[in-house]
Regions:
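Surface-exposed acidic, glycine-flexible loop patches that form ligand/cofactor-binding
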Residues: 11-19
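Detector for C-terminal structural segments
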Residues: 31-43, 64-184
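Short beta-strand and adjacent tight-turn residues that come in two discontinuous sequence segments
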Residues: 53, 57, 75-76
Length: 184
């Protein structure tokens, strides 16, 4: 919501981005990430009047700097390990190795711990929802920008083709090639 962002910037003393401190956005030097960084930079300038310096880095350097907390803005990519909100929310626990922005919120940690112990799925999801609300409302934790997808062309000779939705991988265990009943 660019209008709301402009309003909040003005309330913070930066009308139209004037006087806003310099920001550097670090990202891996891959084409997709470069394209995305340039698009974000243009949107921040056009919508908010904020100048953002772009810094492309080798993947290993970018990850190491992010993990050490040496960044203002950084690109992070995450693919779910399993189809559950916990796989995304767990990385913001205070003691999680993927907590690159060093979120430290006892209330959030407690809700996540409770969700991990809860056996009732409905109650567990409610705890996860509460934890997510704490992140969204009380912390600047991360902003989902991109959701990748794949397109698969599958021969009509293949049956039982199935994608694992959490990792976008083909489940090959039950794939069948051709009609085995017509063999002689």
């Amino acid at each position: 919501d660019p209008d709301k962002a402009k309003e909040l910037l003005a309330e913070a003393g930066y009308p139209d981005g004037e006087g806003f401190p310099a920001i550097t956005y670090k990202y891996p030097s891959l084409q997709l990430d470069s394209d995305m960084a340039q698009a974000l930079q243009a949107q921040w300038k056009t919508n908010l009047g904020i100048e953002v310096e772009l810094q492309a880095e080798e993947q290993q350097v970018q990850v190491a700097e992010r993990r050490s907390g040496d960044f203002q803005l950084a690109r992070m990519r995450w693919t779910a390990d399993f189809t559950d909100p916990f796989t995304f929310l767990s990385m913001y626990r205070s003691n999680d190795s993927y907590n690159d922005n060093k979120t430290n919120c006892p209330e959030y940690d407690e809700l996540m711990a409770q969700s991990n112990e809860e056996s009732d799925p409905t109650a567990r999801f409610e705890l996860l929802h509460q934890a997510e609300s704490v992140l969204v409302n009380d912390y600047c934790f991360g902003v989902p920008v991109l959701n990748s997808s794949n397109i698969y062309l599958v021969s009509t000779d293949i049956t039982n083709f199935e994608i694992d939705p959490s990792r976008n991988m083909i489940r090959t265990k039950y794939l069948v090639l051709g009609d085995s009943s017509s063999e002689s």
